[in-house]
Amino acid sequence: MLSDIAIAQRARLEPITKVAEQIGLGPEDLELYGRYKAKVADHVWPRVRSNPDGKLILVTAISPTPAGEGKTTVTVGLGQAMSRIGKRAIIALREPSLGPAFGVKGGAAGGGYSQVVPMDEINLHFTGDFHAVTAANNLLAAMIDNHLHQGNKLGLDPRQITFKRVLDMNDRALRSVVIGLGGKNGGVPRQEEFMITPASEVMATLCLAEDLADLKRRCGEIIVGYTYDGAPVRARDLKAEGAMATLLKEAIKPNLVQTLENTPAFVHGGPFANIAHGCNTVVATRLALKLADYVITEAGFGADLGAEKFIDIKCRLSGLRPDAVVVVATIRSLKMHGGLKKDDLAREDLEALQRGSANLMRHLRNVTEVFGLPAVVAINRFAADTEAEIALLRALVEEAGATAVVADVHARGGDGGIELAQRVVELVEQPNRFRFAYDDEDSLKTKIEKVATRIYGADGVDFTREASRMLKKLESEGFGRAPVCIAKTQYSFSDDPKKLGAPTGWRLTVREVRPSAGAGFVVALTGEIMTMPGLPPVPAAESIDVSDDGEITGLF
């Protein structure tokens, strides 16, 4: 089988103006970025906002392993399959980050015959949204240090500056640096940390904003640090929000592209799901619901992270409600959760599969029992999967009261997802008992405890002294009703990435709590979460090249 980029380069793309016709958009509704990419103009939303909403389908997954789950691939394949059975569908995805593309992951636009295209352009600079977020973030950072240099009228304590600079690249050397070393005219020396752009508060703020005016207001709410007296200093105190919103003016417009089978796709926004809330923009999701009968969206990593944050943060703050959930699982990954080594995954092992299925069952239970949503399991098929393994996994899922459907969308595109699409169409008509994992009125501490015990399976939560102090401080400052965003390893339900499967008999430790006031949530940090990744021993960048005539190779 051809590589992903080779398949993408051989695709027959339609002009984006023709793709837009499928969802009722004309050339005047688009701002073109070449022949195959466009932003949707501002005037479209007022015209369609009174349209009835389509059905919202959330695609999530088991806890990820190095064996790969293919959540984006299934999301794209399901959208293509919906089109094949005559449904008007739009796919709503996040934009990929440059850092992982050149690091360990490679490209992130689906795989095989279920990709969004132009794949190389989406994975690289796309329409410039990530660069705009980086610029807006670093403008605020520059204004903070300029304020210190120009006399510090606000009394901002350089030791308590919480807002960090960002770069959309994996660069461990920037995790901890000292700035302002240029002498008298070089600013105030202080320690600084860089984060990767998808981890930034500005990215989360963009993705949860309802429109440009709301985005500007939210930018002004960002807490950049604290005064010597402990009072919060916000971006609006530095008069930064107007310039930040100006830099983000184009970035808030949804990006329209297509799949290999010409199904429309909104690819917009890109916060990480282990550090941030892991969902595409509210703006793009809302617009898609007004233009399609079915909107298929995904949330990052496993259902304990992406799906929980999609529901408890994105849905809570926006009013969106999913109609059904697809939980993606692979037999390879479940065998790894069952204790099998990566090198042994190609051989049949029913015992390892049965042990590892506990991970899937906990995710499935969370979706159906905690959140009250109808769900189907999509078995993302790999060539080494045996009929006995598939039969066992189907039986285990049926025992749990759900249905498992094989999705062969990597190899067959939309044709390989027709059974899944038909099942989803049935699911969205089932009774929906949607609910959150916690209530707005719960204390911040209780919210964290409910997610840990109800979703992760923890026995309880331990808070460091500093985390407990910050929780009380945030509640006194008016953050008590905010949702919580728990920053946790994606590889385990627990805060220990080595505890695979569905661990029991453990407690979650919250070591730090910080406000993300622009986004509107409170972040609780657990374990060893890196906000600036590093490159691996052999970065993907070493295999990426471009020919003399401009053809890219090696990008996944």
Curated annotation (Swiss-Prot):
Record field: catalytic activity: (6S)-5,6,7,8-tetrahydrofolate + formate + ATP = (6R)-10-formyltetrahydrofolate + ADP + phosphate
Domain of life (superkingdom): Bacteria
GO annotation terms (biological process): tetrahydrofolate interconversion
Keyword Ligase: yes
Database matches in Pfam families: FTHFS
Full protein name: Formate--tetrahydrofolate ligase
GO molecular function: ATP binding; formate-tetrahydrofolate ligase activity
HAMAP family: FTHFS
Residue numbers binding ATP: 65-72
Keyword vocabulary terms for this entry: ATP-binding, Ligase, Nucleotide-binding, One-carbon metabolism
Organism of this sequence: Symbiobacterium thermophilum (strain DSM 24528 / JCM 14929 / IAM 14863 / T)
Gene3D superfamilies assigned to the protein according to its UniProt record, in alphabetical order: Domain 2, N(10)-formyltetrahydrofolate synthetase, Formyltetrahydrofolate synthetase, domain 3, P-loop containing nucleotide triphosphate hydrolases
NCBIfam families: PRK13505.1 (NF010030)
CDD domains recorded: FTHFS
Matching SUPFAM superfamilies: P-loop containing nucleoside triphosphate hydrolases
Enzyme Commission designation: 6.3.4.3
Gene: fhs
Stored InterPro entries: Formate_THF_ligase, Formate_THF_ligase_CS, P-loop_NTPase
Family assignment from sequence similarity: Belongs to the formate--tetrahydrofolate ligase family.
Pathway note: One-carbon metabolism; tetrahydrofolate interconversion
